[in-house]
Regions:
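Glycan-recognition and catalytic cores of secretory/periplasmic carbohydrate-active enzymes
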Residues: 1-470
């Protein structure tokens, strides 16, 4: 099932008319507000590279390399590589309102390509783009205000405007501050402190820019005294989750536990109140009050599915707590592929648990069609993890893993059948510790090694199997 749906996704990426969207970017004539054309190339590049590498698909990889080269070659000397017209931009207005959101995915695409292939040109392009933002935004420079109001006049004011630099004003600066994530990631890759300092500056000003102390009040969410939906007048799921990933990245770098607490507390609140039984989140793209989760209409946005999955994976990596892997399993088994047309590969904008969608509902491309292909391409990066001698099986599906010093395969028809067989094929490190996720929903888990039952199994935990593998 997984392999087939990933193949459908790969074929969709091959056939997707990415040329015209790359044309749109490199021609650089865009002045309108619309963002859907200018976010396609970033998501497609990352998706295509990952999908091609996973299956050694030369045709797709060649196409991805060609498109990437066109984009990188078009980068201006200043570092700008978005779609906005040069005539539109100036020192006082160096970006379009939706540039930050569009370029978020370009940043991640460049860095992913570098990490997967070692392509230094991609890393250089990411640095040049980051330096463009650092040149114009920072202490004493331009800031991510969501409207013309400034502190303190913006305190507790509802906004319905289009921000000059931070996307939709109704996001209260968070559609600009989301750049803290890829630029902090750039610090992780390069070690250049200017990128860390800039990301910390961004996060440190969210309260001021939003006018609602939305960042600080995440502590109240963590305390259980405030719902995440009450942080500001409109809490856009996908946008908040992109920012949350930046906060977690900064926690990983700095060790600031307050950042982790904010995000983990928000995740718990969302999971307990706003996550559907199918694992998805968002009602008309935002978080609702109480336990309101309509099962029809515009609910469970695919962009939110993508960032919720990524955010949950980051929390799993940081904590090793299986509740995060359980949530990812629920989402992966249900809403991720429910959003995909199993024939054409196109992904939906919203996927309600109830009702039907006509064939022509698969429109686009838009933000969500591209997000659907990106999350499917990212899936293999969530299945397993390795940390020194420890190897973690986070998700169960028929598959084969061939690592540098460890190889195994999993067979069985999970989840239709709850029995799976994991066969270790080779292990150069004979003392590898195999950590198996025991799902919390599994009431009577059983594990055997070479026919011998293992004791001490606890649902909702990882079971560590230590032995000398042959």
């Amino acid at each position: 099932f997984f392999g087939y749906r990933m193949e459908v996704n790969r074929n969709y990426l091959k056939d997707f008319p990415i040329d015209k969207y790359v044309d749109f970017v490199v021609q650089r004539q865009h002045t309108a507000w619309d963002w859907t054309k200018a976010e396609q190339h970033g998501k497609w590049i990352e998706s295509a590279y990952l999908s091609a590498i996973q299956r050694n698909d030369k045709a797709l990889l060649d196409k991805a390399r060609t498109m990437l080269k066109r984009i990188v070659d078009s980068q201006e000397e200043s570092g700008y590589v978005g779609a906005t017209s040069k005539d539109y931009r100036s020192d006082e207005r160096p970006v379009r309102g939706m540039d930050a959101y569009e370029l978020y995915f370009v940043f991640h695409a460049f860095i992913t390509v570098y990490e997967e292939t070692g392509d230094k040109a991609s890393l250089a392009a990411a640095e040049k783009l980051a330096d463009y933002y650092l040149k114009y935004f920072g202490p004493g420079k331009l800031e991510f205000w969501p409207s013309d109001l400034r502190d303190p006049e913006n305190r507790h004011k509802s906004i319905d405007a289009l921000s000059q630099f931070a996307g939709h004003g109704v996001h209260y600066s968070w559609e600009g501050t989301l750049l803290c994530d890829p630029i902090a990631r750039l610090y992780e890759v390069t070690g250049k402190k200017k990128y860390l300092d800039w990301s910390l500056w961004v996060v440190g000003n969210i309260d001021k820019w939003s006018g609602w102390d939305a960042f600080s009040r995440l502590d109240s969410v963590a305390d259980g005294t405030l719902g995440v939906d009450k942080l500001q007048p409109y809490v856009h799921s996908h946008t908040f989750q992109m920012n949350f990933m930046g906060f977690l990245r900064l926690y990983r770098i700095t060790g600031d536990k307050s950042l982790f607490r904010k995000v983990a507390g928000a995740w718990d609140d969302i999971c307990n109140r706003q996550m559907y039984i199918t694992g998805g989140v968002s009602v008309a793209e935002h978080y609702e009050h109480g336990y309101v989760k309509p099962v029809s209409g515009n609910v469970v946005e695919t962009c939110a599915t993508m960032s919720w999955m990524q955010l949950t994976q980051m929390l799993l990596e940081l904590t090793g707590e299986s509740k995060y892997a359980d949530a990812m399993e629920r989402l992966m088994m249900n809403h991720v592929f429910a959003a995909q047309d199993c024939e054409s590969g196109t992904c939906r904008y919203h996927t309600a648990p109830n009702g039907t969608k006509p064939h022509d509902y698969f429109h686009g491309p838009d933000c969500c069609t591209a997000s659907g292909h990106r999350i499917i391409s990212l899936l293999p990066t969530f299945f397993y993890a390795e940390n020194g001698k420890d190897f973690y099986i986070n998700q169960y599906l028929p598959s084969r893993y061939d690592g540098k010093d460890f190889a195994f395969e999993i067979s069985g028809n999970y989840p239709e059948s709850e029995s799976m067989v994991l066969t270790v094929l080779s292990s150069k490190n004979k003392n590898k510790i195999l950590n198996l996720r025991i799902p919390s929903w599994c009431k009577a888990p059983e594990v055997s090694v070479n026919g011998e039952r293992v004791s001490g199994i606890e649902a909702g935990k990882y079971l560590a199997i230590t032995r000398k593998w042959e």
